[in-house]
Amino acid sequence: MAYVPAPGYQPTYNPTLPYYQPIPGGLNVGMSVYIQGVASEHMKRFFVNFVVGQDPGSDVAFHFNPRFDGWDKVVFNTLQGGKWGSEERKRSMPFKKGAAFELVFIVLAEHYKVVVNGNPFYEYGHRLPLQMVTHLQVDGDLQLQSINFIGGQPLRPQGPPMMPPYPGPGHCHQQLNSLPTMEGPPTFNPPVPYFGRLQGGLTARRTIIIKGYVPPTGKSFAINFKVGSSGDIALHINPRMGNGTVVRNSLLNGSWGSEEKKITHNPFGPGQFFDLSIRCGLDRFKVYANGQHLFDFAHRLSAFQRVDTLEIQGDVTLSYVQI
C-alpha cells in the first residue's frame, strides 16, 4: 500500500548514506527540516550540509558537524568559493552514541535555528542567501530513519491541493482530487496533553501528521479523534509499551466497542521517535508509521465529519503536529 505524502510535507524514510538530494521547492523562510536517526555506537562525527547546487565543490551555506574527539563539540561553518570561513563552535554534545535523536533545522530570516530532541541548541546566522540553497547532504557515523521537509510548499486555503514536485520512490503523481490534504498550521513542540481543534471538521482525504518520542520509561499514550459536543471518540489509538500492542477502538454513546490490535510492526518502542500519518477516507482511517502502512480502521461513526477535536495524552513527547 503506497504512502503518498500530503503537499507541504515531503518525507523520505530510511534513506541510505551518503544522502545528497534536492530540497523540494528550495529553501524558504519558515521551512523546517526534520532528521530522525540513531547515532552510531562508535560515532566519531557526522555532518549535515545545506548546499548551493549539486556539483562537487559547491558552496555550503551551512555546515553542521558534531565531533566526538575527546573535546566533544559541534562545529558550524560556511564553504564559499572553495574556502571555509571562520568556525563557530559549541562545546556541548547533544547526541549520545547508540541513541535515537531528532535534529531540526528551522529556517528563519536571520539565521538557522537548530533544535535537538526538542531543545534549542544553536542559531547560525546566514552567510549566504538562504534562497541559494538547493540540496541537503548528510553523511557520517549515523543511521537515518527519516528526513522530512516541512513547509516548503505553499498551501492554498481554497481549491484543490498543490501537486508535490518530488514523489517518493516508487510513487507517481496522483490526480489532484485524490491527494491527501492538510488544513491547519503546524504546531511545534506542543505540550501534552494536547488538544487541537479541527477547523471545519474531519473531511475525507484530510491528513493529520504527528511526530513524537516515546520516553524510555513510557507505559502508554492515546490519540483520540473526538466529537466535542458528545464526547464520542471516532478513533482511539492506544500504544501500550508494556505489552507491545497498539489498541484501536471507538467510544460511541458512552460505550467502548471491540478492540482491534493486529499490526504488522510496532513503531512505538521505548526511547524511539515516530512519524505518524493518519488519513481520513470515505469509509476508513488509514494510518502510516514512518512511511509504512500500520493499520486501517473502518469508520464506526458514520458521520465522521462531526469529529472536531484531536486529543493526545499520556507518556509521549510531541515535536510536531499538523491538523
Curated annotation (Swiss-Prot):
Contains two homologous but distinct carbohydrate-binding domains. Residues 19-150, 194-323 form the Galectin domain. The keyword Phosphoprotein applies. The keyword Coiled coil does not apply. The gene is LGALS4. SMART domains: Gal-bind_lectin, GLECT. Galectin that binds lactose and a related range of sugars. May be involved in the assembly of adherens junctions. CDD domains: GLECT. The modification Phosphoserine is found at residue 258. One of its GO terms (molecular function) is galactoside binding. A beta-D-galactoside binds at residues 256-262. GO terms for cellular component: collagen-containing extracellular matrix; cytosol; extracellular space; plasma membrane. GO terms for biological process: antibacterial peptide biosynthetic process; cell adhesion. PANTHER family: GALECTIN (PTHR11346), GALECTIN-4 (PTHR11346:SF32). Keywords: Lectin, Phosphoprotein, Repeat. Monomer. It comes from the Eukaryota. This is Galectin-4.
